[in-house]
Structure formats: structure tokens, C-alpha cells
Amino acid sequence: MPTREIRHPLIRHKLGLMRRADISTKNFRELAQEVGALLTYEATQDLPLETYEIDGWCGKVSVEKIAGKKITVVPILRAGIGMLDGVLSLIPGAKVSAVGVARNEETLEAHTYLEKLAPDINQRLALIIDPMLATGGSMVATIDLLKKAGCKEIRAMVLVAAPEGIEVVEKAHPDVKIYTASIDQRLNEHGYIVPGLGDAGDKIFGTKQKDA
């Protein structure tokens, strides 16, 4: 399925603020949550609805609610945590399934070190969140894990994506929809997205930042 780059004016504006080299941890964290919420709006537009009846102030009223599968949000640790509150602000009833993936800085290969999945994940729509889709290794490893656990419907939301990472994910899992605020130019020799956001995890948690 093709990757969707969401070019909404609010998203473009907020993403531009996030690219500043001198952005504070507080502002970066708040913007990551806000863009995460806006991406959630786009990624859930096709959820099915069903009609039911309630007692309104003027009598019986027909209203709608989301039908079908329940949702689990899957932050890829650690940086994915930075988008979590924004997503949950729109779908507060969603379960959270955390996945820890580490990348070898020399080989750029990803390995999973933690998985805490919703027990009924095979009955849920999984929304993976991670600020960066760089090489694609962490995303593929997470999708592999979810599918092994029985999850049949998976979508991914990232703030910025590199064409190389998109290609890797689409080749490995063509059934997974990817929603991103920006498809950036490329990866550099260190596997960082250009122009990117820098090290999103460091900026969210206030730890040492790397040039990227």
C-alpha cells in the first residue's frame, strides 16, 4: 500500500518548528505530541461507524460510534513514547503495546529487546508510532513481532521518513499503511534522515543530541 505524506498546513507548520537546531526539549516534546495527534486523525479516517440510539435532551436521537476492531497503540521505544500522549488524546480507550527495538550503530541492524503487547492484540488494529522511519529496520522488526502475535491489521505513523526506509518496509510488508508528516530527502552515511529532525529520542528526553 502506498505511503501517505500528510501535507496539512498545521502539520507542515509544526514540523518546520521541530526542525530548528535550537529547539528546546519542552517545545520538541509538545510538537511531537501535536503532530502525532494530527497524524492519528488522518490514519483513522476510514474506521467503520455504526448507528445507535440515545436519550437526548429532546427525546431519542440516532448517533454514531466507531464499530469493528478495537485499537492498540504501539510505541517503538524509546522515541515513540514522545508521540503517545497525542495519539491517546484522540483515542483514550486504546490499549498500549510497547515494543523496544535497538539499532546497532555500526551495522544499522535492529533487534527487539522488549515486548509488552495487549493480550487480545490479534483482535485489534495496531497503530505503530515512531518519530523516525530511517533505515526501516526497527519498523520491520516491530511489524514482524506484531504479525507473529496474530495481529492482522497494522498501520504506522511517523513524523519523518526516508525514501530508503519506506522502500524497505513496503517491500517486507506491502499490506501495512504508512502515514508520515514528511518524506525527506535521504539517509546520510550514518543512517540518519536528511534534513530530518536530529536524534528525536534525545530531543524528547533531553539527553545528549547528535548531529544528523
Swiss-Prot record:
Uracil binds at I193, G198, D199, A200. GO terms for biological process: UMP salvage; uracil salvage. Gene3D superfamilies: 3.40.50.2020. It comes from the Bacteria. It catalyses: UMP + diphosphate = 5-phospho-alpha-D-ribose 1-diphosphate + uracil. Its EC number is 2.4.2.9. 5-phospho-alpha-D-ribose 1-diphosphate binds at R78, R103, D130, P131, M132, L133, A134, T135, G136, G137, S138, D199. Allosterically activated by GTP. It is an enzyme of class 2 (transferase). SUPFAM superfamilies: PRTase-like. InterPro entries: PRibTrfase_dom, PRTase-like, Upp_B, UPRTase/APRTase, Ura_phspho_trans. CDD domains: PRTases_typeI. GO terms for molecular function: GTP binding; magnesium ion binding; uracil phosphoribosyltransferase activity. This is Uracil phosphoribosyltransferase. It comes from Pseudomonas putida (strain ATCC 47054 / DSM 6125 / CFBP 8728 / NCIMB 11950 / KT2440).
